Design a protein with these regions (language model features):
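Helical "substrate-binding/catalytic lid" subdomain
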Residues: 1-108
């Protein structure tokens, strides 16, 4: 979504294309994190409500710790944990976990 926006593609149009192709997934057709694409999701309410980033961080910690104990690498899980830790340290942990897109946008 962020790439599309940087190419001046309307987010609603891009979501429509994604959702009628093999790119369709839960985060694009049910819980889109990009503001203005869907109604009745946290991104339409300033990322209020929903499942908090702090709870996502807790769950990722449990998953990464379990993987470490069983000696299974979870590279992307560990990276996600670090990103949610950064989000939480910036005081954004009470927001819905989909607000991670705002953190991602700061890296661009």
């Amino acid at each position: 979504m962020t790439l599309g926006a940087s190419l001046n593609i309307d987010p609603k149009v891009l979501a429509g294309v994604l959702n009628t192709s093999s790119a369709r997934c839960w985060s694009s057709d049910t819980y889109n994190p990009y503001p203005g694409v869907m109604e009745n999701v946290p991104s339409a309410r300033g990322y209020t409500g929903g499942f908090s980033a702090d709870l996502m961080l807790k769950d990722l910690g449990l998953a990464v710790d379990s993987a470490r104990l069983s000696k299974h690498p979870v590279l992307m899980g560990a990276l996600a944990q670090q990103l949610y830790q950064l989000m939480s340290s910036k005081g954004e942990g009470q927001k819905d976990f989909s607000a991670i897109i705002k953190l991602y946008q700061t890296f661009l």
